[in-house]
Amino acid sequence: MSIISIAVDAMGGDFAPEAVVSGLDFALTNLLDDQNVSFNIYGQGSQVLPILDKYKDLKEHSVFIDTPEVVLANDKPSFALRKRRSSSMWCAIDSIKSGVTSGVVSSGNTGALMAISRFLLGTLPNIDRPAICTALPSRGEEYFVLLDLGANIESSSNALFQFAIMGSAFAKAVLNIASPKVALLNVGQEEVKGTDVIREAFLLLKQAEGRINFCGYIEPIDILGDKVDVVVTDGFCGNIVLKVAESIAYTFKSVFEKSVTSSIISKFAGLLLKSQMKKDFMRFNPKMYNGAMLLGLNGVVVKSHGNADKVAFAHAIKVTVNAVRNDINAKIIHELS
């Protein structure tokens, strides 16, 4: 297996650079097996190097590049494009363009990450707007793809059509589904429901049934079921759906922990159920599916949650490595041709 190099923005996120560097070590030790991966770590040496020195194995699998600037959480994308060209985020993305690395991951400012990536890397052929995409657990044992998760607050019908094609290709490459079932998120399943944009996207997808396994509309109540493999929506709705799903997972865990300590009987029942409940929660734990790909860019760019700890960031690294190994962009180009 050939070695691949992943660029890492060590300064992005609420807990950077500690969570980033420790997350890299966690990924290397627990998630990547023998994947033959090295890291190009971009950040401010005064903050990153003292942490990196704690992890001998990681140091042997990485190169550190000192960058003087940081893209801040409140930086506007236009400002980051003009004034943050020596930042860890910019330099990490630029390493893909120059061929030094094969993918990049950052927990930093989403708008800046998208803007800089589009500026430096451009988009794939026939793609107007990239979309943020991830695979989420369903009620069964399977996963489904959800996009857009926030790259585009408003989307045209043609953009939703492109998202559907890209999401289908992602499901084929990452989830190994031969003919992914694709649906548009809507307030009802009847063809007359929804906005003009959604109904126009419905018609475009219906006309492309030879290229895509389009199943019509899906309501929010059904997305965690096993009805479809790809759910398509605009970034406004998609981001809300994702955050509500994460909130439900943490709320369920909190409610269960309180209920099993309310009495002696419930404590005993909790002990009996603890192992299975822990297993079930881990599957729905947002940390386990952290890492969303910016689909449609001419390069592998993965956005990690801004509040990711080391475990969550490690899973974003795993997503990045898998996207590179699966040659996801080549498969999207094939689907769009």
From Swiss-Prot:
GO molecular function, one term: phosphate:acyl-[acyl carrier protein] acyltransferase activity
GO terms of biological process kind: fatty acid biosynthetic process; phospholipid biosynthetic process
Keywords: Cytoplasm, Lipid biosynthesis, Lipid metabolism, Phospholipid biosynthesis, Phospholipid metabolism, Transferase
Top EC category: transferase
Intracellular or extracellular location(s): Cytoplasm
E.C. numbers: 2.3.1.274
Pathway: Lipid metabolism; phospholipid metabolism
GO CC aspect terms: cytoplasm
Pfam families to which the protein is assigned, alphabetical: FA_synthesis (PF02504)
Catalysed conversion reaction: a fatty acyl-[ACP] + phosphate = an acyl phosphate + holo-[ACP]
Main location: cytoplasm
Membrane-spanning segments: none
Summary of the function given for this chain in its UniProt record: Catalyzes the reversible formation of acyl-phosphate (acyl-PO(4)) from acyl-[acyl-carrier-protein] (acyl-ACP). This enzyme utilizes acyl-ACP as fatty acyl donor, but not acyl-CoA.
Quaternary context: Homodimer. Probably interacts with PlsY.
Family: Belongs to the PlsX family.
Annotated protein name in UniProt: Phosphate acyltransferase
